Amino acid sequence: MSVYKVIDIIGTSPTSWEQAAAEAVQRARDSVDDIRVARVIEQDMAVDSAGKITYRIKLEVSFKMRPAQPR
């Protein structure tokens, strides 16, 4: 039997939502093993006073949990 955990992560990029998502998943892979699915929950853009746009994306990421170690 498999058990999966789901977490929310947010990525940002000055380029695109796709880049924000890719960087968020790559960063999550640095600390979480066996990511299976990343689902887009929300997308938005932040615009600063100079008109610079930052693309932001919220992802729901699921990964397979390792079996518990015997105590």
From Swiss-Prot:
Positions with a binding annotation for Ca(2+): E18
Pfam families for the chain:
Dodecin (PF07311)
| Top-rank taxon, per record | Bacteria
Q: Which InterPro entries match?
A: Dodecin, Dodecin-like, Dodecin-like_sf
**GO cellular component entries:** peptidoglycan-based cell wall; plasma membrane
Q: Does the keyword Calcium apply?
A: yes
Keywords on this record? Calcium, Metal-binding
Keyword Calcium applies = yes
The record's GO molecular-function terms, alphabetically, read: metal ion binding
So what does this one do? Binds calcium ions. May play a role in sequestering additional small ligands.
Which family, according to UniProt? Belongs to the dodecin family.
What is known about its subunit structure? Answer: Homododecamer; 12 subunits assemble to form a hollow sphere with a diameter of about 75 Angstroms. Calcium ions are bound at the interface between three subunits.
Q: What is this protein called?
A: Calcium dodecin
* Species: Mycobacterium tuberculosis (strain ATCC 25618 / H37Rv)
The coding gene here is: secE2
